[in-house]
Amino acid sequence: MSVKDFTQDLESFLAAFEERLRKVVKSEVEFIGLIEEDLVTAGGKRVRPRLVFLASAALGEVPHALELALAVELIHSASLLHDDLIDDAETRRGREAAFRKYGNAVSVLSGDYLLSRQMALLAQIGNLELVALCAEAARMLSEGEVLQFQVAALGEYSLANYERIIHGKTAALMQLACEGAAVLAEAPLAHREALARFGALYGQAFQMRDDYLDLMGSSEVLGKPAGGDVREGKVTRITLRLLEAYPEEVGAIFRRRGREEGDVRRLQELAQQSKAAEEVIQAIAERVEQAIGALRELPRSAARDQLEALAKRELVRLS
Amino acid sequence: MSVKDFTQDLESFLAAFEERLRKVVKSEVEFIGLIEEDLVTAGGKRVRPRLVFLASAALGEVPHALELALAVELIHSASLLHDDLIDDAETRRGREAAFRKYGNAVSVLSGDYLLSRQMALLAQIGNLELVALCAEAARMLSEGEVLQFQVAALGEYSLANYERIIHGKTAALMQLACEGAAVLAEAPLAHREALARFGALYGQAFQMRDDYLDLMGSSEVLGKPAGGDVREGKVTRITLRLLEAYPEEVGAIFRRRGREEGDVRRLQELAQQSKAAEEVIQAIAERVEQAIGALRELPRSAARDQLEALAKRELVRLS
């Protein structure tokens, strides 16, 4: 297949995805409809559906790839709705967070509605191994998010906890998107494992880059002021290094949740000066390289190249 | 089977249920463990597991009945955790609501954790029709809860909305408990339909009684002051009749959410005086009768008798 044909296939897959999503989340309850509109029109980058498409294309024909993309995206959307309470996010995909418009209650329950629609899709797909895989990803997602809350509340900062959190809250679903395609394709174990590894490592790099930019990015790129994680007491890989290197100064900044004028700027300075920033960029690069390495198990194809390109994009605009 | 043997079977089923529940919800994340303890030790009446047991016993042997009971109870428990945000409940099963101890965030995400464990159970049971049935019940549950919120927010009070709400928030899961057993037993359609009808009607009567007592019950029976629904702007069958009969006076009480001294007492008086209370008791009795009628499709058994007795209990302590 030529790259041009391939790109057209991706476009039509994503168009079909948007159309089906709109139908799947439709409810007779008006308040759910409001959330639904927010979700459907807000769009987002649809990273997970793209992963499902590319993983499927790399394997050849995969039955129910569209339904898998919908199921994964619905778990993701539900987690955004449930996680808005924690994050106290002022913006989410550039729009006012749903819970500010319609209240926490409707947000949480609409998230439950999306999860019920995801279960209906799984029943329709009719693959019990995929049900188990989704259950496992959803378990890691919720555990990762609770752990993040617990670590912030109790100050249990460690690299091990950070790794568990980013795997749970981001990488687990990316892995599901890729591995799920392999399950539906009944792919050989080596291909399934390769895609699972790719999804997990790519997801980790993705979240590490997000966390990096949360501190080091400009507010224009972020669409919100830098340092959001510090204000929520969330330690990321970069601030973990800073806490080790400057326990007193950075510890004090964390205890006051970066509330003093200049706190975030000071963390940025220390990150550059101590080379903590550089180190984290290096760690992301390694994760991207491992992800690409995992793909070597799959036969060369336009889709595999695209997965590689997707992973490499995590290295852009970091340094 | 004698009634004595039968009661022993129920006891051992419930004991096995508690033990498995403890294992199923176990998590390495400490904060989830706190919620879990609350849930496991708090117990509750386990109405849904009882229904699964009785429906299964009425059908003969049902594979995976215990796993079905766990799955249904986990959806119910998750909904309690997610619904605590709405209800602003001061007590839940006589204990401080989980979210007051550990925060809304942990509560919501721990609910998601329970839902993921429920999906894992479904994968283990391995029956795709049951996955579809659970998805449908979970959809109605979330839709019913959002609708309740919407109706309170917009004042869209009607009997039709009330019926949809009680079916969604309570009866759908009761129906799942009974119909799910029939699906696992591969029971004849007539038996499946009979159990589905019984579960739905019993669940409706159950919620109608709950709503009746919320206004008319003593605070000792309720374990909280009467009139909680009024304070949340929730119209139930009884207050719906009062709004029709005394639009100005009762309308004013609802608009101020029963905040004035004597408001709840006045509603109680009007309910007795206008016979609205009596009418609702009558409606509950009809629902119970229909539920028992549905059971007639099943062969007579100790389990069927117990289901009947369970339904009749909804008529106790009302008048």
Where do the language-model regions lie?
Chain A
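N-terminal amphipathic/basic leader segments beginning at the initiator methionine
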Residues: 1-24
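Mg2+-dependent prenyl diphosphate-binding active-site environment of isoprenoid biosynthetic enzymes
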Residues: 15-16, 22-251, 286, 312
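Non-transmembrane, amphipathic alpha-helical segments
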Residues: 2-6, 39, 158, 162-165, ...
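Mobile late-domain/C-terminal helix-loop "cap" segments
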Residues: 249-298
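Short, amphipathic C-terminal "tail helix"
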Residues: 287, 293, 300-319
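A short structural micro-motif
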Residues: 140, 201-202, 259-260, 273-274, ...
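Short, charged, amphipathic alpha-helical segments
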Residues: 8, 193-196, 305-309
